[in-house]
Amino acid sequence: MIFMIITIASGKGGVGKTTTSASLAVALAKLGKKVLAIDGDISMANLGILFNMEKKKPSLHEVLSEEADVRDAIYKHKTGVYVLPTSLSLEGYKKSDIDLLPDVVNEVADDFDYVIIDAPAGLNREMATHLAIADKLLLVVTPEMFSIIDAVRLKESAEMAGTPLMGVVLNRVGRDFGEMGRDEIEMLIKGKVLVEVPEDENVRSAALKKMSVIEYRKNSPASQAYMKLASIIAGVPIYIEDEIKIIRKESFIDKIKRLFRMY
């Protein structure tokens, strides 16, 4: 089986990286692909929480401390996604050896079409390992300057590790009238924005229920955006009923212009 390992990363936290990892995994599974989602941020259990698997034992912690076989720590979710979760245990984290991760991933990667690794945010030793494992890097950013600056640094680190940029997910678009535009972001990162994911309250509601947004509201704007992303990555055409709606907040200047047009 030909497989692809995709590390999903962001230069800073809070941009929706884990949401993107879970949603892309579910979307690829809906397209008939066999997908393994790995909770690569071993100090947290965010991906495991979204799949409601943070209490599973053994977990990646036990695998990285050589207390369990990796195949015993992989669980099939109801969406069809296979998940290698991390636990909430601080002791488990302390016992884990991140240097074992490449061998762990390579042991099972050829059982799947796609391996999605939800990497920790920022630039650190763990991130270096995740970049070295990956065939491709998928960056998640929000349309804000600090998010973009951190993403540029992360992309440069990936290039040094020999990991090419697959593209950029521009997340939470339409939240603020002061946000940067797509063209400006592509110019700064020197990478293509594959999809714009609109600000969507369904994402937060889904997370509270420990679900991906695609499970929660399959026709929501964010769900459609993630299905589009999976379609681009897998090369499988899909039909989206409506154009993805991105409602941008009206700036003060736009409001003044609109008022003048009324007279």
Curated annotation (Swiss-Prot):
Pfam families: AAA_31
Keyword hit for ATP-binding: yes
GO MF: ATP binding; ATP hydrolysis activity
Listed GO CC annotations: cytoplasmic side of plasma membrane; cytosol
Residue numbers binding ATP: 12-19
Transmembrane segments: none
Family under the similarity heading: Belongs to the ParA family. MinD subfamily.
PANTHER family with a match to the protein in the record: ATPASE INVOLVED IN CHROMOSOME PARTITIONING, PARA_MIND FAMILY (PTHR43384:SF10), SEPTUM SITE-DETERMINING PROTEIN MIND HOMOLOG, CHLOROPLASTIC-RELATED (PTHR43384)
Protein name (database record): Uncharacterized ATP-binding protein MJ0169
Source species: Methanocaldococcus jannaschii (strain ATCC 43067 / DSM 2661 / JAL-1 / JCM 10045 / NBRC 100440)
